[in-house]
Amino acid sequence: MNKAFTREVDRDDEDDEADLESPVLPSGAKNYITAGGYRRLRDELKALLDDERPKIVETVSWAAKNGDRSENGDYLYGKKRLREIDRRIRFLTKRLDLAEVVDSTVHHGNDQVFFGATVRFASDQGEERTIRILGVDEAESARGEVSWVAPIARALLKARVGDEVKLVTPRGVETIEVLEVRYPPPGGEADVVRA
């Protein structure tokens, strides 16, 4: 068969789905991020560019020399992994270019909720929770971190200790009371940065 009518498999439908799983930033919103979050994204980008991508390129190059690419698992997996890495590199580059680093330590001692705050609050049922309000690219809900665009964060922003705010949930409107607001001390944001 003529080579013009065959094509090497270079894309998977699964690859496009990965972009849909990325944190969504509302249109026109700034990409706020803490210094620690910015460092983590920058370090990940550097590791991909300096370490992981060159290793995969070397593997793909070696595998390509081994003949029939259509049944060459090392080649096919390597190409797929290379696409994933390149997509992540593009994503990180865009996010870092748009990032606006916010120093939350300037609010240390303040009782008002701003970006970077750790907030302890109680629901109208008396349940207490503590969350930290971070950027969309750094928040991990399993660690009690929420994005500043999340409904709970939007409800709490600018509230002060003792304030009651309304939170719209699927179960209806809840009233939550701000019990405590904390920020990292000046020069101490590195202490709360995950490794």
Protein language model regions, located:
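Non-DNA-binding regulatory cores of transcription-related proteins
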Residues: 102-176, 182
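Structured, basic alpha/beta domains of bacterial-type, RNA-associated proteins
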Residues: 86-107, 175
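Conserved NTP-handling cores and scaffolds of large molecular machines
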Residues: 45, 49-52, 96-100, 160, ...
